[in-house]
Structures are given as C-alpha cells and as structure tokens.
Regions:
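Short alpha-beta junction capping motif
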Residues: 55, 118-163
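Bacterial N-terminal signal peptides
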Residues: 11-25
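Extracytoplasmic/secreted envelope proteins and their assembly/folding machinery
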Residues: 89-93, 139, 143, 163-167, ...
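An acidic, glycine-rich "communication" segment
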Residues: 36-39, 63-70, 162-243, 247-248, ...
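Aromatic-Pro/Gly-enriched surface loop or interdomain linker
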Residues: 28-123, 129-130, 241-244, 248-276
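N-terminal secretory signal peptides that target proteins for export/translocation
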Residues: 1-9
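Surface-exposed patches in mature extracellular/periplasmic domains of secreted proteins
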Residues: 102-112, 154-159, 177-185
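A generic secondary-structure signal for well-formed alpha-helical elements
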Residues: 100, 150, 170-177, 273
Length: 276
C-alpha cells in the first residue's frame, strides 16, 4: 500500500512538472523568439538598423499548414521554415562581417510572401523547401521578386521525394524556367572563394552516424534557375545541409572542413547575388 502511494505521488509530481514546463515554454514564446534549442533575443536598435544587406529568411506555410512556430512538419516539432533558426543565421552573419566588406545588419530578418516587404531585401534564404506551399498570390509575388533582381537560396532538403515536392512549389513560381546543374567553372563558385572542388556538407547527424547523406540523397546537387539574361535567381543546394554546418561550426565534434565549405558557399552566393 505504501509503495502504491509513493508511485501515485511520483506520477502526480511528474505530471505537475510537465505542466510547468509547458507553461514556461508558452511564456518564453510570448516574451521573445523561441526555437528548438532555446530563446534568442536581439535589441530593437539592431533590428531597425539600416544596411545595404539584410540576411532574410523566408517564412512560408508548409504542407502541414504551419507558418509560425508550432507543431507541424519541421524539425523538433517546429515549423519547417525555422529549422536552425536563429543560431545558424547569426553565426553566418558574423562570418559575413569578418570576411567581406558588405555593410550588413547584424541580425536576421523574417520575410513573408503576403506583403510587398520582400522587395526591400535583395537576398532570401529558405530551408526545408520540400514542405513549402504557396497560394497563387504568394507564388506571383515571389516570381516578381526574383525577376526584378531578387535572389533565393534554398537548402536542407534531401532525396528524390523531397526534390519532387520542392519542384511542385517551384513550378508555381517559375513555370517556364528550367533547372540546370551548375558546372565547377560557373562564376558563382569563384566570385569570392574558388570552389571548383566541393563536397557534400552534412547536418549535425554526421556526428553520431558518420553519414554525410539523408534519405536517398547520396550525391550533392548544385543546381540553379536563371532568368532570361542568364543571371542565377534561385541557387539550389540539394542533398546537403549548410544551415546545420553554420549552426554547429562552434561544436568541437562537428568537422571543421564541413563548416568551412558551408560558409564559403554561402558567402559566394551572397556576393554573387549582391553583384548581379
């Protein structure tokens, strides 16, 4: 009988603890930015700082119906667009500041396709793009953004099924523009760093599994969509996870060569986008 009472008391305390954690999580979410590994704040002054370059991350509605933080298709229960956010963004911005002369805002910017605000930002990054969905109005706005000089970099989707779902959305946006494999001599790989020789950049899972690939994405694909003048308007990083490499560059167990390659690719893409 005494053992049963102890068991019931332990179960009650466990339930109260879970409820308390849930309430704390909701409070943190209401007070500031919250993501899968904690809270990340920045000052109002930083978020309003004027610059020539803004790191912009695309917030989209996923196939699970999620656009804000919340449970749905994504990583760790978070909406897919927010994977690695915001640590990957912040760490990449530190590298951009140190290694280029681009005058940039030190914090990230979230952009949506439901307003014309996206036209204020020259370069946009999107992840988990196998899960994105667009309304006709959103697809039209993204198409106009790209054809008027914008640049989109997509990352962190893997294998055949992810590619097919990504292309459903991409064909809404640019139905008449072909996708091409980029050659090693393409200008985008040489505007800042010479990246004629590249390799697959895995996510954090490499530390525990030793695998550089996810799903059936065994071979990295460097692809692009160009406008009628030949300018790359969509840079496609398929079968790799550059954002994870940026995020975990300070993790001793994550190999430096992967992080270094990921940063160089991102920096090249930004310099290309800002000069074309």
């Amino acid at each position: 009988m005494q053992l049963q009472r102890r068991f019931r008391m332990a179960a009650l305390l466990l339930g109260l603890g879970c409820a308390l954690l849930t309430l704390c999580g909701l409070a943190a979410y209401a007070q500031g930015r919250f993501y899968s590994r904690g809270r990340y704040d920045y000052s109002d002054a930083q978020s309003q700082e004027k610059a020539e370059f803004y790191w912009s991350r695309l917030r989209y509605t996923s196939s699970g119906g999620q656009s804000n933080f919340g449970f749905g298709f994504g990583y760790g229960g978070w909406a897919g667009w927010s994977r690695d956010y915001p640590k990957a963004d912040r760490q990449f911005l530190m590298a951009l500041k140190r290694l280029t002369r681009i005058q940039m805002r030190p914090v990230e910017q979230i952009v949506d396709l439901d307003s014309d605000e996206i036209f204020n930002y020259p370069w946009v990054y999107a992840v988990q793009v196998a899960n994105w969905t667009f309304t006709d109005a959103q697809a039209k706005r993204l198409r106009e953004y790209l054809l008027k000089g914008g640049f989109l970099m997509v990352d962190d989707f893997h294998g055949t099924a992810d590619w097919d779902r990504f292309m459903v959305g991409m064909r809404q946006v640019l139905p008449d523009r072909p996708v091409e494999d980029l050659g090693d001599n393409d200008e985008i790989f040489h505007v800042l760093y010479d990246l004629g020789e590249r390799f697959q950049v895995p996510g954090e899972q490499y530390v525990n599994t030793g695998r550089t690939y996810e799903k059936d994405g065994y071979v990295p694909k460097w692809r692009a969509i160009r406008d009628e003048k030949g300018r790359i308007i969509v840079a496609i990083c398929h079968n790799m996870h550059l954002g994870d490499a940026w995020e975990w560059a300070d993790m001793p167990e994550y190999p430096e060569n992967f992080a270094s390659m990921a940063y160089r690719i991102g920096l090249n893409y930004i310099v290309y986008g800002m000069t074309h």
